[in-house]
Amino acid sequence: MLYPQEFDVIVVGGGHAGTEAALAAARMGCDTLLLTHNIETLGQMSCNPSIGGIGKGHLVKEVDALGGAMAAATDESGIQFRILNSSKGPAVRATRAQADRILYKAAIRQRLENQPHLWLFQQAVDDLMVEGDRVVGAVTQVGIRFRARTVVLTAGTFLDGKIHVGLNNYPAGRAGDPPAVSLSARLKELKLPQGRLKTGTPPRIDGRSIDFSKLIEQPGDGVAAADGTPASSPMPVFSFLGSAAQHPRQMPCWITNTNQRTHDILRTGFDRSPMFTGVIEGVGPRYCPSIEDKINRFADKNSHQIFLEPEGLTTNEYYPNGISTSLPFDIQLAAVRTMLGMENAYILRPGYAIEYDYFDPRELKTSFESKAIGGLFFAGQINGTTGYEEAAAQGLYAGANAALQAQGNPPLSFGRDQAYLGVLVDDLITKGVTEPYRMFTSRAEFRLQLREDNADMRLTEIGRSVGLVDDVRWDAFNRKRDAVSRETERLKSTWVHPAILPAADSERLFGKALEHEYNLADLMRRPGISYDTVAEALTIARPGNYVSRETLNSQLGADLAAAVIEQLEIAIKYAGYIDKQNEDVQRAAHYEHLRLPDELDYAQVTALSFEVRQKLTKHRPETLGQASRISGVTPAALSLLLIHLKRGRFKGFTGNDKVAAGPISADAVNTDINDNPAHAATDAA
């Protein structure tokens, strides 16, 4: 039957990508339908019970800055919070949280059920409705046909999924859930380039069978250790609107290690390993290898650290992070019991590997819309990524762009200098994947600007402009932005000099007496000098006219005041580095945002090698920046392409343009670039 209601956006799949996609489209005012094979598993954490980490935490903060749900749900469900790389620079500091699976899923479900313009429907999708070269809806397993202007596919590991435990395997989307075999077959019929990837998960352990007295405790930040050692730092918060008061009871993680005996037992199972015997065809994640892969690749290491992570407050289940495996169950059990504290471990669920289909993200436009099928968007593991955070970011992005298309508006996009989400999208659509892609800070060229702490400053205004950000978040953002601006100006315009700050106080606070007059911002630039230090100096130098944390706390509240002070300290201390990176961004912008003509026939650019012409024709990059990141497209090839465009007299590519000159206005070029078909090459560049 044809369902009587037509939707603006249909989202297929209810994992981390699907839920963010559906919420984003609905927040933007589009009538949105979320189709899932099981409403009870919406927002389920299929693998590890954690959110965030290096690079990943940055994505979560960006999703939050754009109005997404992941950070807020983590604040409501997180049972341990830590700041990773806390001793390093602000660009690579990252928030990570252990989450209670049940609480996290409930937090996501609550948001989905109460979001205006969003409908939920429990049915697996078996087919897409395609008319000509455009998708117009989806068909469920019992033949219900839903029509929509756009469709977002977020199928995760379900497309023709197959679980492996030893040499035994069976069809599944994940443990306990059926695969999406019919939908996978339908996508292959549409001639969309695809491949196989694999990921895995470790066996789960009953905590009652673990001897924690033998293990090393790892408490979270902001929590006193079991021996009474006080917390050395405040408890982190994920959402810009969150607070530590939202966190449930906190729990520690525990550390054990594999040993030589563990490795010996694991090796005895290699002849029954689906990975080593060639049963698994898909490529696994490089940065989250199985334990058998680790001991095979790093044979010189006799031990690997294993983190025992609690699955929640109301369960005894533990997740042993570091021993993902697809070896036979008898090997899993024997190996686990060789580890300290795990001698009597009881396994609740076996570890397994799962193979699944993904579709080549190089066949997507910058908006994540398919180049082949109009209105069809892809997000999450179907694009070849791995990780909840990468999926959530893609889901929000694809959902927003599906909504914008349904509304008749231009797509949303982010540059590599604007967001980790921009880096993620650009990497996927220009480079593609040969293994599951995960985010790291090292993937971003401009990471000093792409910090966790300023994700809202970078993105919330953009999110507001397209309807992603509600009034509550917008008001909070403006309060923070105004406070940062106001306080920055006050620090720059408030001066102290030797006559009013005694030498003894100056030496105590700054290490030496002041030589001349300084404003507070200049003093804060010194190593080891904080906002509180200059505030104390001002209290002494100008009693009654002072800047202080207490003043900000009373004006803004403690959480917002702390965020404002963090922004002030980073912006002032790293101003020189940030300014230099801004110059790098401006230099790169000349090429990065310069759009290539849609009608450009690369086969006619005879100065280019056959390989380069072939790759440019295949991938059809939208900008010169994207073209530069395609494998095999060299700087020399770009120069030859520029010469061709100049000879063709495309707007912005005239004979007088100099490659090394200052940036040409990309906006001016892009206005008319596609209105000027190439002429015969008659003049010199």
Curated annotation (Swiss-Prot):
| Cofactor dependence | FAD
Which chain regions cross the lipid bilayer? none
Q: Record-annotated residues binding FAD? A: 13-18
Q: GO MF annotations for this entry?
A: flavin adenine dinucleotide binding
> What positions does the entry give for NAD(+) binding?
284-298
GO CC terms, sorted: cytosol
GO terms under biological process = tRNA methylation; tRNA wobble uridine modification
Mind telling me which SUPFAM superfamilies this protein's record contains? FAD/NAD(P)-binding domain
Is rRNA processing among the key words of this record? no
Supply the PANTHER family for this chain: GLUCOSE INHIBITED DIVISION PROTEIN A (PTHR11806), PROTEIN MTO1 HOMOLOG, MITOCHONDRIAL (PTHR11806:SF0)
Question: What this chain does, per the record?
Answer: NAD-binding protein involved in the addition of a carboxymethylaminomethyl (cmnm) group at the wobble position (U34) of certain tRNAs, forming tRNA-cmnm(5)s(2)U34.
What is this protein identified as?
tRNA uridine 5-carboxymethylaminomethyl modification enzyme MnmG
The organism is Leptothrix cholodnii (strain ATCC 51168 / LMG 8142 / SP-6) (Leptothrix discophora (strain SP-6))
Q: Which gene encodes it?
A: mnmG
